[in-house]
Amino acid sequence: QSPGFPVTLLNIKTDDIWIRDYGPFFVKQGKRTIVSETQFNAWGAKFPPWKNDNQIPARIMKATGYGKGTSVPFIFEGGAIEVNGDGLGITTLDCLVGKNRNKPEDMSKIIKAICEMLGLKSLLILPHGLNGDHTDGHIDNVARFIAKDKVVIAWDKGMKSKNAQVLSEAKYLIETWLKAFYAKNAVVETLPLPPQRKLSDGQILPASYMNFIFVNGGLIYPKYKCKNDAVAQKFFEKAFPDRIVIGIDSRTVIEEGGSLHCMSKHESR
């Protein structure tokens, strides 16, 4: 416990920084918090080792004293799911089944297990995520809930962009799905992507403003030193007038394939 700050530091060994994906799911059962988990294998066995990462939920549960929740027996990462707190969730197909992930024939079991773990009544499965995302297309780079009936989605109008069609289809699917639950109150807004950079080896960096995080009284979003940073700042300030909005230069961290949301794990109140 840090003096003067409500922060407890846990010294736990990991294999990678992206705790969003291998960390615990903090689930509320009334006033009680439990720790649930899915299985993790470093995004389809792309980046070994992952032994330490896969043990993080159990170690955090022991350190916090929280109760034991569900252990889902399927490969699935925290960055692959976005929920609204009202029984709705969004994910992408490529993160559910695929090479070194889960078998297509287990799809119905996977959906049921995720919905039961998170208390979801509906899980929307988008076909794809951003081009170049080596997580197989996490939703936290594509679209996020900013209210129970409102979603913001990354946007690209470039005629030659591989993301343009993916995001246009995703927007249509989200709008149709959201209206089924919230009718005319359902809203899907767009926020332009920053320019998509490439490394010297040709690897595309899936930079996105969707990788923002909520903190107590604030919102922190990734910046990429481009003109769309100002657009993102204005959008978040308008969407969350009661929060302090801060942008952090994330050009270095995106070179490792993730950003702020990926390297953090929140515990809901």
Regions found by a protein language model. Give the residues of each.
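The feature marks the mature, well-folded catalytic cores of soluble enzymes
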Residues: Q1-R269
